Amino acid sequence: MHRSVPRDGFTLPAVALSPYGTGVLYAIGAGVALGTLGPVSNIAYAAGMGSPTFAAMRATIGALVLLAFAGRAERRVSLRSLSRREQGTFALTAAAQACLSLALFAAYGAMTVALVLAVYFSYPVLVAGASVALGRERLTATRVTSLGVALAGLLVIVLGRMGPDAHVSLPGLALAAVAACCQATYLVASRNGFTRVPSTQAVTVILAGAALAIWAVALPVDGVSGRLTAWVAEPSAWLAILFAGAVGAGLAKVWLLKGVRRVGGTRSSVLMLAEPLTGVLLAAFLLGQPIGLPELLGGAGVLVGAILAQRPAAATAARVTAAA
């Protein structure tokens, strides 16, 4: 008989799954939701929005949407009741989220997108290494295989989408590497950093803190270029940023935290490789970008890696963090 999982807003529909199985779905769902950001951001940029403003608006809208749900659908925990370590982890996670958004969007402007993704999506390896070093997970043969197969599939997709005009830049490589480190930090720190705080409330705090930090960059950068408000009269930009905030920030980050708390950082990071697959499919549907043999073969590799990653060890399946 499976234990019930606490409901605290933005939960998946009730299904006959164990808490571990539900965590697998949450991690995949988070990857799919985050995968919408690439095509959606292109719509906003085409309407005149700058990338720092997009990142700041996304975090702000996500925090506001979650604030409404957190107040109605779940218990709250006073942040003052948290230990200094837990409060420090909150601050670290918010800083990682802000740095991730700024570094990734800046990398896209400095180097070919395919190369940025090839570097950025190395973060599952960083998560696995950190989790093993901290004694949270064991580096089993299945886990190594799932990482290798999934990352090889991703590399096939990325290299298959590189054109003859692809260019490498040291700033672009550095920014993409920083983004990967920030994502790994987010996943590792949030795993056990503040488990008493429900997921929706925790992500609300993280996004709010990240929004403040990103606005500190967006206001001067896009204010000077004129892209801070150039988009406000465009309905397409509003639709894009509202979707990115509600789904690509609020929903995605809550599901991500729920997944990490249930199945761990390494498995979640591999399952979240659904993100680039979603981006490729949406780019084909919304932007008319074709899907070729590399995308099909690479997608198969990512799926095989995800299937291997979601297989739980007996001890892991039985031990799920209570504060989901």
What are these regions (language model features)?
Residues G35, P39, T60, A94-L102, ...:
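Hydrophobic/small/kink-forming positions within alpha-helical transmembrane segments
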